[in-house]
C-alpha cells in the first residue's frame, strides 16, 4: 500500500516485507524512481518494512514526447538536450532562464533537424563558455530563434553548425568573448542570420561580432542593431547562391 502526503509517495506498508526480501534494494529503488525527476531518496530497511521518502525538483527542460523539450524554470547547470532520428524541438516558456558558472548554458544536438524557440525577453541565457551550442549532424534544418539576451562569457554567444539543409538564426542581443554569433552551414540550403539587438564580442583584433560560413545556397545577414568586435561581420559564401549583408 502506498501512503501519500501532499500528492507524493511518503511510505510503503510493512506488507512489502516479502517483496523486500526477494529483490535487491538497488533494483527496488530504481523501480520506485521511474518518472521521478531528480528524486532524492532516503530508505530505511528494517524488520518493520521499508520507509521511502522522496523529494523532487522539476528539471528546467522536460522531454515529452521524444525529442520535444519544454523548459520552464530557472537552471544553473548545462542543459544538454538531444534527439536521434527525430526533430529536436526545444521551446522556452516564461519563467525559464539559464545561468551557468561552468560549461555552456544550452547544448543542443540532433541528426534530424533542430528547432529552438525562445519568445520570452526575460528568459536570459548565459553560459560560462557559450550561451547556445547547437549541432545538427544529419538531415533537416537548424533553426534558432531567441528574443532574450544570449551570452557566452568565454567563447560564443551562439554557435550553430548544420550539416542538413538550411541554417537560420534570429536573435536579439548576443554577446560572446571570441565571437558573438558563429554560424557554419555545410548543408544544402541557405544560411540566414537576423539580429534585432546588439551583437558583440570583445574588442581584441581576433574577435568577431558575426562570423558566417556557408556551403549551401544563399548567405543572408540582416542586422538592425550594432555589431561589434575586432571585426564586425565576417561572411564567406562558398555556396551556389548570393551573399547579401544589410545593416
Name each model-derived stretch.
Residues 1-46:
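Bacterial Sec-dependent N-terminal signal peptides
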Residues 65, 69-77, 81-103, 118-129, ...:
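Beta-strand-rich solenoid/repeat architectures in extracellular/passenger domains
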Residues 43, 49-55:
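Terminal targeting and flexible regions in eukaryotic proteins, enriched
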Amino acid at each position: 500500500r502506498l501512503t501519500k502526503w501532499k500528492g507524493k509517495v511518503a511510505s510503503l506498508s510493512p506488507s512489502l516485507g516479502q517483496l523486500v526480501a526477494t529483490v535487491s534494494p538497488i533494483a527496488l529503488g530504481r523501480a520506485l524512481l521511474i518518472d521521478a525527476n531528480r528524486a532524492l531518496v532516503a530508505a530505511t530497511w528494517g524488520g518493520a518494512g521499508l520507509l521511502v521518502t522522496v523529494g523532487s525538483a522539476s528539471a528546467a527542460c522536460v522531454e515529452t514526447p521524444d525529442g520535444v523539450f519544454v523548459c520552464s524554470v530557472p537552471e544553473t547547470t548545462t542543459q544538454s538536450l538531444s534527439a536521434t532520428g527525430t526533430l529536436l524541438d526545444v521551446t522556452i516558456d516564461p519563467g525559464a532562464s539559464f545561468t551557468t558558472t561552468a560549461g555552456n548554458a544550452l547544448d543542443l544536438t540532433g541528426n534530424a533537424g533542430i528547432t529552438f524557440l525562445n519568445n520570452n525577453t526575460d528568459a536570459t541565457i548565459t553560459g560560462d563558455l557559450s550561451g547556445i551550442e547547437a549541432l545538427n549532424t544529419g538531415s533537416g534544418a537548424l533553426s534558432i530563434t531567441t528574443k532574450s539576451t544570449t551570452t557566452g562569457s568565454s567563447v560564443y554567444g551562439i554557435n550553430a553548425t548544420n550539416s542538413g539543409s538550411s541554417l537560420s538564426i534570429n536573435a536579439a542581443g548576443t554577446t560572446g568573448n571570441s565571437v558573438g554569433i558563429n554560424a557554419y552551414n555545410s548543408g544544402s540550403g541557405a544560411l540566414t542570420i537576423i539580429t534585432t539587438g546588439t551583437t558583440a564580442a570583445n574588442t581584441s583584433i581576433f574577435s568577431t561580432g558575426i562570423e558566417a560560413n556557408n556551403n549551401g545556397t544563399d548567405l543572408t545577414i540582416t542586422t538592425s542593431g550594432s555589431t561589434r568586435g575586432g571585426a564586425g561581420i565576417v561572411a564567406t559564401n562558398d555556396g551556389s547562391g548570393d551573399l547579401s549583408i544589410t545593416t
